[in-house]
């Protein structure tokens, strides 16, 4: 990755980080556990006392919310 790409990547990371602070729970926690913690949906579901499917749905909703906000803020 060249210097320009690294800067773009860093800017994107900062935008996502700011957006995470605007997400409600459990979206923020599930998204963070999945992306940064690299936990499986099964493990995330167990942490919350929910199903694997619940964790998957919440994660994908969180991603959609982040994507929508990124488009709004662009």
Predicted regions and their residues:
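Acidic, proline/glycine-rich intrinsically disordered inter-domain spacer in sigma factors
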Residues: 1-21
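The N-cap/first-turn positions of alpha helices
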Residues: 26-27
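A short pre-motif secondary-structure segment
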Residues: 30-34
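Flexible coil/turn residues that form the inter-helical turn or adjacent wing/linker of helix-turn-helix
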Residues: 37-38
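DNA-recognition helix of helix-turn-helix
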Residues: 42, 46-73
